[in-house]
Regions:
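N-terminal low-complexity or simple alpha-helical regulatory segments
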Residues: 1-87
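Long, amphipathic alpha-helical coupling/dimerization segments that relay conformational signals between
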Residues: 2-8, 60, 64-165
Length: 165
């Protein structure tokens, strides 16, 4: 299949990134604008769009999309170490998803004129992808904040106990 979405994302990377950053700066529900430099804020966008473009071009199934999101787990780790709160990461990803959907409605129609179902399928795959990115962020934050607790080994089935007379 031609690399239509990947090349579309590459062609419009800078204006897309600026549009998304403007959304982040305008959103008063996060401190991302004061917490991160512009470079820190946007450094993950090319990698996210590259992975998503590949998944859309290949018409990936849900399992492949989950694996693609898992490969981007480093994004959530970086945000955790930068001191970004989990709700801010979630808001950041929601804004990125919204900006991407707006972009796809405006720009991808030309790619899918022959079959409008392609755009619908791309939007559905993108939605799954961003849901999985949120899941990965929650997992990273949960595992990073969890205290180290010693665990005992498990034996199954448990040994039989003798009855006490």
């Amino acid at each position: 299949m031609p690399r239509r979405f990947s090349s579309l994302f590459r062609q419009h990377l800078d204006p897309f990134t600026r549009a998304w950053a403007d959304e982040v700066y305008a959103d008063r529900r996060t401190d991302l604008a004061t917490l991160l430099t512009f470079r820190e804020l946007v450094e993950h966008v090319p990698e996210v769009l590259e992975e998503l473009g590949r998944l859309l071009d290949e018409r990936a199934d849900a399992e492949e999309i989950c694996e693609g999101a898992r490969r981007l787990r480093g994004y959530a780790r970086v945000r955790f170490h930068q001191g970004v709160l989990i709700d801010e990461v979630a808001r950041e990803l929601m804004l990125l998803r919204g900006t991407l959907f707006e972009f796809l409605w405006q720009e991808a129609r030309g790619l899918t004129e022959d079959d409008p179902r392609l755009l619908r399928d791309a939007l559905r795959r993108a939605e799954i992808f961003f849901d999985e990115l949120l899941v990965e962020a929650v997992l990273v934050y949960a595992s990073s904040l969890r205290p180290v607790v010693p665990t005992r080994g498990s034996v199954w089935p448990p040994p039989r106990r003798r009855r006490q007379p």
